[in-house]
Amino acid sequence: MVILLRSIPKGDDSMNLYTVSFFGHRQIDNIFVIEERLETMIRELLLSKEYVEFLIGRDGEFDQLVASTVRRCKRAIRDDNSALVLVLPYATAEYLNNEQSFHEYYDEVEVCAESAEKHFKSAHQTRNRSMVDRSNLVVFCVNHNSGGAYQTMQYAIKANANIINLSDVTR
Protein backbone atom coordinates (compact mmCIF):
# COMPACT_ATOMS: atom_id res chain seq x y z
CA MET A 1 0.00 0.00 0.00
CA VAL A 2 1.58 3.27 -1.14
CA ILE A 3 0.54 6.36 0.80
CA LEU A 4 1.07 9.68 -0.92
CA LEU A 5 2.65 12.51 1.01
CA ARG A 6 0.02 14.73 2.59
CA SER A 7 0.14 18.39 1.72
CA ILE A 8 -0.22 19.76 5.23
CA PRO A 9 1.27 22.81 6.90
CA LYS A 10 3.98 22.62 9.54
CA GLY A 11 2.53 20.65 12.41
CA ASP A 12 -1.22 20.50 12.88
CA ASP A 13 -2.72 22.73 15.56
CA SER A 14 -5.88 20.62 15.94
CA MET A 15 -3.94 17.74 17.47
CA ASN A 16 -0.66 19.44 18.32
CA LEU A 17 1.32 17.49 15.75
CA TYR A 18 5.03 18.28 15.87
CA THR A 19 6.93 17.17 12.77
CA VAL A 20 10.68 16.52 12.73
CA SER A 21 12.66 15.56 9.64
CA PHE A 22 16.19 14.17 9.51
CA PHE A 23 18.94 14.49 6.89
CA GLY A 24 22.57 13.41 6.95
CA HIS A 25 25.46 12.20 4.87
CA ARG A 26 25.49 8.60 3.70
CA GLN A 27 28.46 7.93 5.97
CA ILE A 28 28.86 9.60 9.35
CA ASP A 29 31.82 10.16 11.63
CA ASN A 30 31.60 9.79 15.42
CA ILE A 31 28.58 7.53 15.19
CA PHE A 32 28.36 6.94 18.96
CA VAL A 33 28.41 10.67 19.73
CA ILE A 34 25.74 11.34 17.10
CA GLU A 35 23.62 8.45 18.42
CA GLU A 36 23.81 9.84 21.96
CA ARG A 37 22.76 13.29 20.74
CA LEU A 38 19.89 11.79 18.75
CA GLU A 39 18.69 9.74 21.70
CA THR A 40 18.69 12.77 24.01
CA MET A 41 16.74 14.85 21.50
CA ILE A 42 14.21 12.12 20.65
CA ARG A 43 13.64 11.37 24.35
CA GLU A 44 12.93 15.05 25.01
CA LEU A 45 10.51 15.26 22.07
CA LEU A 46 8.61 12.13 23.14
CA LEU A 47 8.25 13.47 26.67
CA SER A 48 7.38 17.08 25.80
CA LYS A 49 5.20 16.93 22.67
CA GLU A 50 1.64 15.70 22.34
CA TYR A 51 2.35 13.86 19.08
CA VAL A 52 5.61 13.66 17.12
CA GLU A 53 5.94 12.66 13.49
CA PHE A 54 9.53 11.59 12.70
CA LEU A 55 10.16 11.86 8.94
CA ILE A 56 13.14 10.00 7.52
CA GLY A 57 14.53 8.73 4.24
CA ARG A 58 16.37 5.49 3.68
CA ASP A 59 19.49 6.70 1.97
CA GLY A 60 22.44 5.94 4.21
CA GLU A 61 23.99 5.44 7.62
CA PHE A 62 22.39 8.47 9.26
CA ASP A 63 18.88 7.45 8.19
CA GLN A 64 19.44 3.95 9.58
CA LEU A 65 20.78 5.37 12.83
CA VAL A 66 17.79 7.70 13.21
CA ALA A 67 15.28 4.92 12.50
CA SER A 68 16.81 2.52 15.02
CA THR A 69 17.16 5.26 17.65
CA VAL A 70 13.54 6.37 17.25
CA ARG A 71 12.34 2.76 17.51
CA ARG A 72 14.48 2.14 20.61
CA CYS A 73 13.28 5.34 22.30
CA LYS A 74 9.65 4.55 21.50
CA ARG A 75 10.02 1.14 23.17
CA ALA A 76 11.82 2.54 26.23
CA ILE A 77 9.91 5.80 26.77
CA ARG A 78 6.49 5.70 25.12
CA ASP A 79 5.11 4.57 21.81
CA ASP A 80 1.63 6.08 21.89
CA ASN A 81 2.45 9.63 20.79
CA SER A 82 4.62 9.31 17.71
CA ALA A 83 5.05 7.82 14.28
CA LEU A 84 8.22 6.85 12.44
CA VAL A 85 7.44 7.77 8.83
CA LEU A 86 9.56 6.67 5.89
CA VAL A 87 9.21 9.20 3.07
CA LEU A 88 10.30 7.79 -0.27
CA PRO A 89 10.99 10.01 -3.29
CA TYR A 90 9.19 7.45 -5.49
CA ALA A 91 8.02 3.86 -5.17
CA THR A 92 11.31 1.97 -5.41
CA ALA A 93 11.61 -1.63 -6.54
CA GLU A 94 12.98 -2.47 -3.08
CA TYR A 95 9.81 -1.09 -1.48
CA LEU A 96 7.43 -2.68 -3.98
CA ASN A 97 9.12 -6.10 -3.57
CA ASN A 98 9.23 -5.90 0.25
CA GLU A 99 6.17 -3.83 1.12
CA GLN A 100 5.15 -5.94 4.12
CA SER A 101 8.62 -5.71 5.70
CA PHE A 102 8.67 -1.93 5.27
CA HIS A 103 5.27 -1.59 6.96
CA GLU A 104 6.38 -3.84 9.82
CA TYR A 105 9.45 -1.68 10.49
CA TYR A 106 8.03 1.83 9.92
CA ASP A 107 4.76 3.11 11.36
CA GLU A 108 3.93 4.69 8.00
CA VAL A 109 5.43 4.66 4.52
CA GLU A 110 4.75 7.59 2.21
CA VAL A 111 5.71 8.31 -1.36
CA CYS A 112 6.18 12.03 -1.88
CA ALA A 113 3.70 13.09 -4.56
CA GLU A 114 5.85 16.00 -5.76
CA SER A 115 9.02 13.96 -6.22
CA ALA A 116 7.32 10.88 -7.67
CA GLU A 117 6.56 12.95 -10.77
CA LYS A 118 10.15 14.23 -11.19
CA HIS A 119 13.13 12.71 -12.98
CA PHE A 120 14.81 10.25 -10.62
CA LYS A 121 17.96 12.39 -10.44
CA SER A 122 16.05 15.33 -8.94
CA ALA A 123 13.49 13.29 -6.99
CA HIS A 124 15.53 13.06 -3.75
CA GLN A 125 16.06 16.81 -3.51
CA THR A 126 12.38 17.47 -4.29
CA ARG A 127 11.36 14.99 -1.56
CA ASN A 128 13.82 16.57 0.89
CA ARG A 129 12.47 20.07 0.30
CA SER A 130 8.92 18.83 0.77
CA MET A 131 9.93 17.26 4.10
CA VAL A 132 11.61 20.50 5.23
CA ASP A 133 8.52 22.51 4.30
CA ARG A 134 6.23 20.39 6.46
CA SER A 135 8.58 20.21 9.50
CA ASN A 136 8.62 22.16 12.74
CA LEU A 137 12.23 21.04 13.30
CA VAL A 138 14.82 19.85 10.80
CA VAL A 139 17.74 17.83 12.18
CA PHE A 140 20.95 17.45 10.19
CA CYS A 141 24.18 15.52 10.53
CA VAL A 142 26.23 17.47 8.01
CA ASN A 143 29.97 17.99 8.39
CA HIS A 144 31.10 18.85 4.85
CA ASN A 145 29.96 21.30 2.22
CA SER A 146 28.76 18.96 -0.50
CA GLY A 147 26.12 16.36 -1.18
CA GLY A 148 22.36 16.15 -0.95
CA ALA A 149 22.16 16.61 2.82
CA TYR A 150 24.25 19.78 2.56
CA GLN A 151 22.03 21.09 -0.26
CA THR A 152 18.96 20.37 1.85
CA MET A 153 20.51 22.20 4.81
CA GLN A 154 21.12 25.24 2.60
CA TYR A 155 17.47 25.10 1.49
CA ALA A 156 16.30 24.86 5.13
CA ILE A 157 18.44 27.86 6.11
CA LYS A 158 16.99 29.93 3.23
CA ALA A 159 13.48 28.84 4.24
CA ASN A 160 14.15 30.01 7.84
CA ALA A 161 13.43 26.53 9.15
CA ASN A 162 14.19 25.66 12.77
CA ILE A 163 17.33 23.53 12.35
CA ILE A 164 19.83 21.61 14.44
CA ASN A 165 23.06 20.22 13.00
CA LEU A 166 24.15 17.38 15.29
CA SER A 167 27.66 17.65 13.88
CA ASP A 168 27.89 21.20 15.30
CA VAL A 169 26.46 20.51 18.75
CA THR A 170 29.11 20.82 21.43
CA ARG A 171 28.97 19.60 25.00
Give short role names for the model-derived ranges.
Residues 1-14:
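Short, Lys/Arg-enriched N-terminal segments with co-localized hydrophobic residues
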Residues 11, 15-170:
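Acidic/glycine-enriched connector segments
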